[in-house]
């Protein structure tokens, strides 16, 4: 069977997304990030009009949120989209390269932890920054529930994002956000027309055994 990607489920719906919540429920390798970079980002650039003529304040912009610094580095590489290795750990050099890349005029990449820090500094300043964006992408959205047991600040990021659902297109993406999906369905804030899913692929591992003695291991190898 030919592998399917989430873009084949969404098709052209993204062109008609209105303000509110979008849920993309799909596993690793389903093309969630690829959809954002190769479909939604070019669409945002197109909708913004000519780069040299358009008012920067009227650009259609995307804020891409993720839960870990290593993932942020991967997303930044994907935004460049040139197949080159960029020095994401060298801020000054990276900043110069980003300024030279058109894509970064339309998309920013943050961690959820940055949202938390900025909110603690000044909720008002953070709101002014977030008001610049049309799309908010919440990658690995299970962070809001999965990390909550050991990170009391997680709810800050979630509340900040939730406040924008009425004024932005907020896209939640994850393979394991069932708790969030159940909550949104219960409170009536997730339309089934805004829910996109791909069945999770079964892994290749059928059985996992642990052997604590060398003899057991040797018998398995010899069998």
Residue ranges of predicted features:
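Residue-level preference for the first positions of well-ordered beta-strands
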Residues: 19-23, 61-63, 106-107, 135
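SF2 helicase catalytic motif II
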Residues: 127-162, 169
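Inter-Walker segment of RecA-like/P-loop motor cores
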Residues: 79-125
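Post-Walker A helix-loop "phosphate-sensing" segment adjacent to the P-loop in P-loop NTPases
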Residues: 42-62
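Structural recognition of the conserved hydrophobic beta-strand(s) that form the central parallel beta-sheet
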Residues: 64, 108-111, 137, 168-175
């Amino acid at each position: 069977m030919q592998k399917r990607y989430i873009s084949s489920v969404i098709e052209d719906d993204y062109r008609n997304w209105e303000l509110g919540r979008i849920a993309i429920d799909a596993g690793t390798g389903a093309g969630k990030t690829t959809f954002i970079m190769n479909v939604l980002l070019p669409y945002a650039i197109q909708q913004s009009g000519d780069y040299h003529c358009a008012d920067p304040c009227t650009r259609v912009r995307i804020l891409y949120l993720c839960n870990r610094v290593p993932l942020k580095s991967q997303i930044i590489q994907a935004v460049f989209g040139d197949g080159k290795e960029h020095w994401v750990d060298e801020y000054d050099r990276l900043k110069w390269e980003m300024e030279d890349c058109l894509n970064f005029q339309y998309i920013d990449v943050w961690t959820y932890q940055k949202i938390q820090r900025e909110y603690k500094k000044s909720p008002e300043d953070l709101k002014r920054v977030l008001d610049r964006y049309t799309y908010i992408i919440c990658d690995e959205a299970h962070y809001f529930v999965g990390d909550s047991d050991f990170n009391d600040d997680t709810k800050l990021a979630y509340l900040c994002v939730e406040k924008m659902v009425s004024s932005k297109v907020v896209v939640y993406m994850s393979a394991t956000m069932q708790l969030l999906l159940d909550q949104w369905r219960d409170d009536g804030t997730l339309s089934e027309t805004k829910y996109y899913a791909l069945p999770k692929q079964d892994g290749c591992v059928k059985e996992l055994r642990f052997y604590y003695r060398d003899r057991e291991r040797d018998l398995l190898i010899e069998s």
